[in-house]
Amino acid sequence: MSRLTTLRLTVAATLITIFAGGAIIASQKSAANMAKAAAGFLDSLTPEQKANVAFPFESDERLRWHFIPNETFPRKGLMIKDMNETQRRLAHDLLRSGLSARGYLKVTSIMELEDILKVIETGGKFARNKEEYLFSIFGTPAASGRWGWRVEGHHVSVRFAVADGAVTDNVASSPMFLGTNPAEVREGDRKGLRVLADEEDAARALVMALPAELQKQAVVSAIAPADILTMNKNDIKPLPDQGVLYAALPAQQQALLSRVIEVYTSNMEADIAAERLAKIRAAGMDKIRFAWLGETDKGKKHYYSVQGPTFLIEYDNTQNNGNHVHSVWRDFNGDFGRDVLREHLKKDAH
Protein backbone atom coordinates (compact mmCIF):
# COMPACT_ATOMS: atom_id res chain seq x y z
CA MET A 1 0.00 0.00 0.00
CA SER A 2 1.45 3.39 -1.00
CA ARG A 3 2.29 6.11 1.51
CA LEU A 4 -0.32 8.36 -0.13
CA THR A 5 -3.03 5.72 0.27
CA THR A 6 -2.03 5.14 3.88
CA LEU A 7 -2.16 8.88 4.55
CA ARG A 8 -5.62 9.17 3.01
CA LEU A 9 -6.94 6.29 5.11
CA THR A 10 -5.44 7.74 8.29
CA VAL A 11 -7.02 11.11 7.55
CA ALA A 12 -10.40 9.45 6.90
CA ALA A 13 -10.28 7.63 10.22
CA THR A 14 -9.21 10.82 12.02
CA LEU A 15 -12.09 12.77 10.48
CA ILE A 16 -14.54 10.17 11.75
CA THR A 17 -13.17 10.73 15.25
CA ILE A 18 -13.41 14.52 14.91
CA PHE A 19 -16.94 14.49 13.56
CA ALA A 20 -18.08 12.09 16.27
CA GLY A 21 -16.56 14.24 18.98
CA GLY A 22 -18.53 17.24 17.78
CA ALA A 23 -21.85 15.45 17.79
CA ILE A 24 -22.82 16.55 21.30
CA ILE A 25 -24.43 19.59 19.67
CA ALA A 26 -26.70 17.01 17.97
CA SER A 27 -28.58 17.94 14.84
CA GLN A 28 -30.32 21.17 15.80
CA LYS A 29 -29.04 23.05 12.76
CA SER A 30 -30.35 20.48 10.30
CA ALA A 31 -33.60 20.16 12.26
CA ALA A 32 -34.18 23.91 11.97
CA ASN A 33 -33.37 23.88 8.26
CA MET A 34 -35.74 20.96 7.72
CA ALA A 35 -38.58 22.70 9.55
CA LYS A 36 -38.14 25.84 7.47
CA ALA A 37 -37.98 23.90 4.19
CA ALA A 38 -40.94 21.66 5.05
CA ALA A 39 -43.11 24.59 6.10
CA GLY A 40 -42.27 26.43 2.89
CA PHE A 41 -43.15 23.38 0.83
CA LEU A 42 -46.47 22.88 2.64
CA ASP A 43 -47.39 26.55 2.23
CA SER A 44 -46.97 26.24 -1.54
CA LEU A 45 -49.51 23.43 -1.88
CA THR A 46 -53.18 23.63 -2.76
CA PRO A 47 -55.64 22.20 -0.20
CA GLU A 48 -56.06 19.11 -2.38
CA GLN A 49 -52.30 18.58 -2.64
CA LYS A 50 -51.81 19.15 1.07
CA ALA A 51 -54.39 16.46 1.83
CA ASN A 52 -52.18 14.00 -0.07
CA VAL A 53 -48.97 15.13 1.61
CA ALA A 54 -49.80 15.76 5.28
CA PHE A 55 -50.30 12.96 7.82
CA PRO A 56 -50.30 12.82 11.62
CA PHE A 57 -46.92 11.90 13.06
CA GLU A 58 -48.52 8.86 14.71
CA SER A 59 -49.93 7.64 11.38
CA ASP A 60 -49.13 4.05 10.42
CA GLU A 61 -48.27 5.45 7.00
CA ARG A 62 -45.01 6.79 8.46
CA LEU A 63 -43.86 3.21 9.06
CA ARG A 64 -44.71 1.95 5.56
CA TRP A 65 -41.73 1.78 3.27
CA HIS A 66 -40.25 -0.10 0.37
CA PHE A 67 -37.76 0.28 -2.46
CA ILE A 68 -39.67 -1.45 -5.26
CA PRO A 69 -41.60 0.35 -8.05
CA ASN A 70 -44.84 2.16 -7.26
CA GLU A 71 -46.84 -0.30 -9.36
CA THR A 72 -46.07 -3.11 -6.91
CA PHE A 73 -46.05 -0.99 -3.73
CA PRO A 74 -48.50 1.94 -3.99
CA ARG A 75 -47.33 4.91 -1.95
CA LYS A 76 -49.06 7.94 -0.48
CA GLY A 77 -47.77 11.45 -0.93
CA LEU A 78 -47.39 13.94 -3.76
CA MET A 79 -45.42 12.98 -6.86
CA ILE A 80 -42.92 15.38 -8.36
CA LYS A 81 -44.77 15.15 -11.68
CA ASP A 82 -47.87 16.61 -9.99
CA MET A 83 -46.04 19.70 -8.69
CA ASN A 84 -45.61 23.06 -10.38
CA GLU A 85 -42.15 24.53 -10.83
CA THR A 86 -42.21 26.45 -7.54
CA GLN A 87 -43.35 23.39 -5.63
CA ARG A 88 -40.65 21.26 -7.24
CA ARG A 89 -37.99 23.74 -6.21
CA LEU A 90 -39.28 23.78 -2.64
CA ALA A 91 -39.50 19.98 -2.57
CA HIS A 92 -35.86 19.76 -3.60
CA ASP A 93 -34.98 22.34 -0.94
CA LEU A 94 -36.52 19.96 1.60
CA LEU A 95 -34.54 17.03 0.19
CA ARG A 96 -31.32 19.07 0.39
CA SER A 97 -32.02 20.04 4.01
CA GLY A 98 -31.24 16.54 5.25
CA LEU A 99 -28.62 15.42 2.76
CA SER A 100 -25.06 16.41 2.01
CA ALA A 101 -24.24 17.60 -1.49
CA ARG A 102 -22.95 14.08 -2.17
CA GLY A 103 -26.11 12.46 -0.83
CA TYR A 104 -28.38 14.80 -2.78
CA LEU A 105 -26.48 14.04 -5.99
CA LYS A 106 -26.84 10.30 -5.39
CA VAL A 107 -30.59 10.52 -4.78
CA THR A 108 -31.30 12.71 -7.79
CA SER A 109 -29.02 10.58 -9.98
CA ILE A 110 -30.95 7.46 -8.93
CA MET A 111 -34.12 9.23 -10.02
CA GLU A 112 -32.50 10.02 -13.38
CA LEU A 113 -31.69 6.33 -13.86
CA GLU A 114 -35.40 5.73 -14.43
CA ASP A 115 -35.00 7.38 -17.85
CA ILE A 116 -32.20 4.95 -18.68
CA LEU A 117 -34.29 2.00 -17.52
CA LYS A 118 -37.14 3.18 -19.73
CA VAL A 119 -34.86 2.81 -22.75
CA ILE A 120 -33.36 -0.50 -21.63
CA GLU A 121 -36.74 -2.02 -20.74
CA THR A 122 -38.71 -1.05 -23.83
CA GLY A 123 -42.13 -2.61 -23.41
CA GLY A 124 -41.45 -3.55 -19.78
CA LYS A 125 -44.15 -3.92 -17.14
CA PHE A 126 -43.14 -0.81 -15.19
CA ALA A 127 -43.77 2.77 -16.33
CA ARG A 128 -40.35 4.20 -15.53
CA ASN A 129 -40.59 7.91 -14.71
CA LYS A 130 -37.98 10.02 -12.93
CA GLU A 131 -40.77 12.24 -11.55
CA GLU A 132 -42.71 9.44 -9.84
CA TYR A 133 -41.15 10.06 -6.44
CA LEU A 134 -43.45 11.06 -3.61
CA PHE A 135 -43.01 13.59 -0.79
CA SER A 136 -44.88 13.19 2.50
CA ILE A 137 -44.83 15.13 5.78
CA PHE A 138 -45.85 13.76 9.18
CA GLY A 139 -46.92 16.13 11.92
CA THR A 140 -46.36 19.89 11.94
CA PRO A 141 -42.88 21.14 10.99
CA ALA A 142 -41.69 23.23 13.93
CA ALA A 143 -38.77 23.87 16.25
CA SER A 144 -40.48 21.82 18.95
CA GLY A 145 -42.61 18.70 19.02
CA ARG A 146 -42.31 15.60 16.87
CA TRP A 147 -42.61 15.61 13.11
CA GLY A 148 -40.98 14.04 10.08
CA TRP A 149 -40.80 13.79 6.32
CA ARG A 150 -40.21 11.18 3.66
CA VAL A 151 -39.23 10.88 0.01
CA GLU A 152 -39.90 7.53 -1.65
CA GLY A 153 -40.04 5.82 -4.99
CA HIS A 154 -38.18 3.15 -6.90
CA HIS A 155 -34.76 2.63 -5.28
CA VAL A 156 -35.10 5.69 -3.01
CA SER A 157 -36.39 5.66 0.55
CA VAL A 158 -35.22 8.65 2.58
CA ARG A 159 -36.85 9.79 5.79
CA PHE A 160 -36.20 11.97 8.80
CA ALA A 161 -37.94 12.16 12.17
CA VAL A 162 -37.34 15.25 14.28
CA ALA A 163 -37.87 15.27 18.02
CA ASP A 164 -37.16 17.64 20.90
CA GLY A 165 -36.98 15.54 24.12
CA ALA A 166 -34.10 14.54 26.30
CA VAL A 167 -34.33 10.86 25.50
CA THR A 168 -34.37 10.80 21.71
CA ASP A 169 -31.87 12.33 19.32
CA ASN A 170 -32.86 15.55 17.59
CA VAL A 171 -32.94 13.89 14.17
CA ALA A 172 -33.37 10.25 13.16
CA SER A 173 -32.67 9.24 9.57
CA SER A 174 -33.30 5.55 9.04
CA PRO A 175 -34.13 3.32 7.32
CA MET A 176 -32.30 4.93 4.42
CA PHE A 177 -32.30 2.93 1.21
CA LEU A 178 -30.51 3.74 -2.04
CA GLY A 179 -30.41 1.44 -5.05
CA THR A 180 -29.33 1.54 -8.67
CA ASN A 181 -30.31 -0.34 -11.80
CA PRO A 182 -28.14 -0.49 -13.72
CA ALA A 183 -25.36 -0.27 -11.17
CA GLU A 184 -23.08 0.60 -14.09
CA VAL A 185 -24.49 2.12 -17.25
CA ARG A 186 -22.89 0.13 -20.06
CA GLU A 187 -24.17 1.89 -23.16
CA GLY A 188 -25.49 5.22 -24.36
CA ASP A 189 -24.60 8.79 -23.43
CA ARG A 190 -24.18 7.94 -19.73
CA LYS A 191 -21.94 4.93 -20.33
CA GLY A 192 -19.67 4.32 -17.35
CA LEU A 193 -21.95 6.04 -14.80
CA ARG A 194 -21.89 4.28 -11.40
CA VAL A 195 -24.05 6.25 -8.99
CA LEU A 196 -23.20 4.05 -5.98
CA ALA A 197 -19.60 3.37 -6.96
CA ASP A 198 -18.19 4.33 -3.56
CA GLU A 199 -20.42 1.85 -1.76
CA GLU A 200 -19.02 -0.98 -3.87
CA ASP A 201 -15.43 0.14 -4.26
CA ALA A 202 -14.76 0.94 -0.59
CA ALA A 203 -15.91 -2.50 0.55
CA ARG A 204 -14.07 -4.33 -2.21
CA ALA A 205 -10.89 -2.41 -1.36
CA LEU A 206 -11.24 -3.66 2.21
CA VAL A 207 -11.87 -7.31 1.42
CA MET A 208 -9.03 -7.42 -1.12
CA ALA A 209 -6.60 -5.77 1.32
CA LEU A 210 -7.19 -8.31 4.09
CA PRO A 211 -4.40 -10.78 4.91
CA ALA A 212 -5.29 -14.30 3.81
CA GLU A 213 -6.43 -15.57 7.21
CA LEU A 214 -8.60 -12.54 7.87
CA GLN A 215 -10.05 -12.71 4.37
CA LYS A 216 -11.14 -16.27 5.12
CA GLN A 217 -13.00 -14.94 8.16
CA ALA A 218 -14.57 -12.07 6.23
CA VAL A 219 -15.74 -14.03 3.17
CA VAL A 220 -18.32 -16.28 4.80
CA SER A 221 -19.90 -17.70 1.64
CA ALA A 222 -19.12 -18.02 -2.05
CA ILE A 223 -22.79 -17.37 -2.81
CA ALA A 224 -24.43 -13.99 -2.28
CA PRO A 225 -28.05 -13.74 -1.09
CA ALA A 226 -30.65 -12.66 -3.63
CA ASP A 227 -31.32 -9.38 -1.80
CA ILE A 228 -30.64 -7.49 1.41
CA LEU A 229 -31.65 -9.79 4.25
CA THR A 230 -33.76 -7.30 6.20
CA MET A 231 -35.80 -6.33 3.13
CA ASN A 232 -38.43 -3.70 4.07
CA LYS A 233 -39.13 -4.96 7.59
CA ASN A 234 -40.16 -2.25 10.03
CA ASP A 235 -38.49 -3.74 13.06
CA ILE A 236 -35.23 -5.62 12.64
CA LYS A 237 -32.90 -7.57 14.87
CA PRO A 238 -29.13 -7.93 14.44
CA LEU A 239 -27.98 -10.46 11.88
CA PRO A 240 -26.16 -13.54 13.22
CA ASP A 241 -22.54 -12.76 14.07
CA GLN A 242 -20.38 -13.48 11.05
CA GLY A 243 -17.36 -12.03 9.33
CA VAL A 244 -14.30 -10.35 10.76
CA LEU A 245 -14.21 -8.02 13.75
CA TYR A 246 -12.83 -4.49 13.54
CA ALA A 247 -10.73 -5.31 16.60
CA ALA A 248 -8.99 -8.12 14.68
CA LEU A 249 -7.92 -5.89 11.79
CA PRO A 250 -4.53 -4.24 11.32
CA ALA A 251 -4.60 -0.44 11.47
CA GLN A 252 -4.70 0.05 7.70
CA GLN A 253 -7.64 -2.30 7.31
CA GLN A 254 -9.40 -0.64 10.25
CA ALA A 255 -9.11 2.61 8.31
CA LEU A 256 -10.59 0.90 5.25
CA LEU A 257 -13.56 -0.34 7.29
CA SER A 258 -14.01 3.15 8.72
CA ARG A 259 -14.06 4.39 5.14
CA VAL A 260 -16.91 2.00 4.26
CA ILE A 261 -18.97 3.39 7.14
CA GLU A 262 -18.11 6.96 6.16
CA VAL A 263 -19.42 6.37 2.63
CA TYR A 264 -22.87 5.83 4.12
CA THR A 265 -22.82 8.47 6.85
CA SER A 266 -21.55 11.11 4.42
CA ASN A 267 -24.85 11.00 2.55
CA MET A 268 -26.32 12.98 5.46
CA GLU A 269 -25.79 16.60 6.42
CA ALA A 270 -22.60 16.92 8.46
CA ASP A 271 -24.26 17.28 11.88
CA ILE A 272 -26.52 14.28 11.30
CA ALA A 273 -23.53 12.26 10.10
CA ALA A 274 -21.61 13.28 13.22
CA GLU A 275 -24.47 12.11 15.41
CA ARG A 276 -24.51 8.74 13.65
CA LEU A 277 -20.76 8.36 14.09
CA ALA A 278 -20.93 9.35 17.75
CA LYS A 279 -23.41 6.54 18.40
CA ILE A 280 -21.15 4.06 16.63
CA ARG A 281 -18.06 5.04 18.58
CA ALA A 282 -19.90 5.11 21.89
CA ALA A 283 -21.09 1.55 21.30
CA GLY A 284 -17.56 0.41 20.44
CA MET A 285 -15.75 0.28 17.12
CA ASP A 286 -14.09 -2.99 18.11
CA LYS A 287 -17.50 -4.71 18.10
CA ILE A 288 -18.20 -3.94 14.44
CA ARG A 289 -18.18 -6.89 12.03
CA PHE A 290 -17.63 -6.92 8.28
CA ALA A 291 -18.90 -9.87 6.24
CA TRP A 292 -18.69 -10.51 2.49
CA LEU A 293 -20.73 -13.08 0.58
CA GLY A 294 -20.23 -13.96 -3.07
CA GLU A 295 -17.33 -13.43 -5.43
CA THR A 296 -14.76 -10.71 -4.92
CA ASP A 297 -14.05 -9.98 -8.59
CA LYS A 298 -15.61 -6.81 -9.95
CA GLY A 299 -18.71 -7.45 -12.02
CA LYS A 300 -19.62 -10.62 -10.12
CA LYS A 301 -22.57 -11.09 -7.76
CA HIS A 302 -21.74 -10.05 -4.22
CA TYR A 303 -23.13 -8.88 -0.88
CA TYR A 304 -21.65 -7.39 2.25
CA SER A 305 -22.78 -6.26 5.68
CA VAL A 306 -21.26 -3.98 8.29
CA GLN A 307 -22.86 -4.48 11.68
CA GLY A 308 -22.25 -2.90 15.05
CA PRO A 309 -24.21 -2.91 18.31
CA THR A 310 -26.42 -0.03 17.14
CA PHE A 311 -26.53 -0.18 13.35
CA LEU A 312 -26.52 -2.34 10.23
CA ILE A 313 -25.36 -1.62 6.70
CA GLU A 314 -26.39 -4.05 3.97
CA TYR A 315 -25.31 -3.95 0.34
CA ASP A 316 -26.40 -6.44 -2.30
CA ASN A 317 -25.49 -6.58 -6.00
CA THR A 318 -26.90 -9.81 -7.40
CA GLN A 319 -29.84 -8.97 -9.65
CA ASN A 320 -29.37 -8.18 -13.33
CA ASN A 321 -26.38 -10.52 -13.31
CA GLY A 322 -24.53 -8.47 -10.73
CA ASN A 323 -25.44 -5.03 -12.07
CA HIS A 324 -28.28 -3.97 -9.76
CA VAL A 325 -27.49 -2.56 -6.31
CA HIS A 326 -29.59 -2.44 -3.15
CA SER A 327 -28.08 -0.70 -0.11
CA VAL A 328 -29.57 0.24 3.24
CA TRP A 329 -28.68 1.75 6.60
CA ARG A 330 -30.70 0.54 9.60
CA ASP A 331 -30.62 1.55 13.28
CA PHE A 332 -31.63 -1.17 15.70
CA ASN A 333 -33.16 1.26 18.20
CA GLY A 334 -33.71 4.35 16.07
CA ASP A 335 -35.47 3.39 12.83
CA PHE A 336 -38.35 5.76 12.06
CA GLY A 337 -37.28 7.93 15.00
CA ARG A 338 -38.55 5.43 17.52
CA ASP A 339 -37.94 6.39 21.12
CA VAL A 340 -37.36 2.96 22.60
CA LEU A 341 -37.73 4.04 26.22
CA ARG A 342 -40.96 5.94 25.67
CA GLU A 343 -42.43 3.12 23.59
CA HIS A 344 -41.57 0.73 26.40
CA LEU A 345 -43.25 2.94 28.99
CA LYS A 346 -46.29 3.33 26.76
CA LYS A 347 -46.65 -0.44 26.43
CA ASP A 348 -46.28 -0.90 30.19
CA ALA A 349 -49.12 1.55 30.76
CA HIS A 350 -51.60 -0.76 28.99
Regions found by a protein language model. Give the residues of each.
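Helix-centric, low-specificity signal for extended rod-like, repetitive segments
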Residues: 1, 21-22
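Bacterial N-terminal signal peptides that target proteins for export
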Residues: 2-12
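Bacterial N-terminal signal peptides
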Residues: 10-21
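A cross-kingdom marker for long, charged
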Residues: 25-350
